[in-house]
Amino acid sequence: MQQEGGPVRSAPCRTGTLEGSRQGSPGHRKRASPKGSLSSAQPHSWMLTPSPLNSHCAHREPISSSPQPVANGPKQKKKSNWRSTTRLRIIRLRDRLEPRPLAILEDYADPFDVQETGEGSAGASGAPEKVPENDGYMEPYEAQKMMAEIRGSKETATQPLPLYDTPYEPEEDGATAEGEGAPWPRESRLPEDDERPPEEYDQPWEWKKERISKAFAVDIKVIKDLPWPPPVGQLDSSPSLPDGDRDISGPASPLPEPSLEDSSAQFEGPEKSCLSPGREEKGRLPPRLSAGNPKSAKPLSMEPSSPLGEWTDPALPLENQVWYHGAISRTDAENLLRLCKEASYLVRNSETSKNDFSLSLKSSQGFMHMKLSRTKEHKYVLGQNSPPFSSVPEIVHHYASRKLPIKGAEHMSLLYPVAIRTL
């Protein structure tokens, strides 16, 4: 039913809700809470528009302009809160279902690959290409290949990389650089131009012994003129032993087999010359040399730069040889050889066997000590591969002009004897 002059409201689906609010006596209105009175006095805006939840209710009732009595204040408040909450939920659901435009962020950073692709396209269109900074990042091989195709292969190699290194020897066809017609001047080292004998082809480093010996031929006087004191182990500091200490005592005992002494490879500094008996030792030789064989003065006139070793008289006894130092230790022998050049040698008594001798030699790798063993037939052999000799001077005389049969010294000979120093 409708009343004239009043607004129309939709009747709720739940019966008894509005009727209960209308019923009540004036005493009930007086005892109502202030909050309930205020909420009842205010116009119900949510009742003016039909709610989606109550759209199926077609019956409408007029709302009187006069204030309606409020019977239950708390219940009415709960109902209004429930309706407002339901309406907010519907609005939120509608907002979720409606499509929204995507927000584009201006500060988005593209990956490194995207930047490289953009620069490649800009370079192909004609704009100047920007060279990226070298930050240590390297593209994979496939990516580099694709980028090269995009850029159009601007940088092309003018000359392909050679697969092999340039040979050391120039071409033999006569064509040289800068259009010169003369062939390239060089010293031929081919086998047909080689001056060495066939048995020396396996030692290519030993070319021209004369040149090597002249290059390392430094006189001992240069060392003495230096302002600083002589180093430890110089020739002047070597002790001179009396003649009685060099005599070999005891009968000869047979040995099972000749053996090599252990060699010590100590790398030394630059090569220096050894004191030759033909220079300063000529006037200071022991007195026993003056009474010896006059042939012993022959090696004193030979030059140390000769490819052959200084001549040794094999008939002269061992005690009268200038390169025999008697009973000195291995350390003293190395100190004597330290200032001498390569292929310098001396003979001393063996420290392990009193009937044997040791040959101390200076090589390019250090010092070598080889044993001169005595066999059952009272012969002497050098190492294990040399033929037997009747005496030690014969061994020195033989290998002064021949290669040593010792492993590690096959390319060497006994060239420069280390003479004895006397005070």
Curated annotation (Swiss-Prot):
SUPFAM superfamilies to which the protein is assigned, alphabetical: Nucleotidylyl transferase, SH2 domain
Location of the SH2 domain: 323-418
Classification via CDD domains: SH2_SHF
Region (Disordered): 1-87, 110-208, 225-312
Phosphotyrosine found at: Y201
Expressing tissues: Expressed in skeletal muscle, brain, liver, prostate, testis, ovary, small intestine and colon.
MF terms in GO: phosphotyrosine residue binding
Post-translational modification: May become phosphorylated upon binding to PDGFRA.
Protein origin, superkingdom: Eukaryota
Acidic residues bias: start-end ranges: 192-203
GO biological process: apoptotic process
Any Pfam family: SH2
SS bond list: none
Keywords: Apoptosis, Phosphoprotein, SH2 domain
Subunit relationships: Interacts with phosphorylated 'Tyr-720' of PDGFRA via its SH2 domain.
Miscellaneous note of the record: The sequence described in PubMed:11095946 is over-extended by 57 aa at the N-terminus due to the presence of an uncorrected 5' mismatch compared to the reference genome sequence.
Function text: Adapter protein which may play a role in the regulation of apoptosis in response to PDGF.
Name the UniProt record assigns to this protein: SH2 domain-containing adapter protein F
Organism field: Homo sapiens
Lineage: Eukaryota, Metazoa, Chordata, Craniata, Vertebrata
Gene: SHF
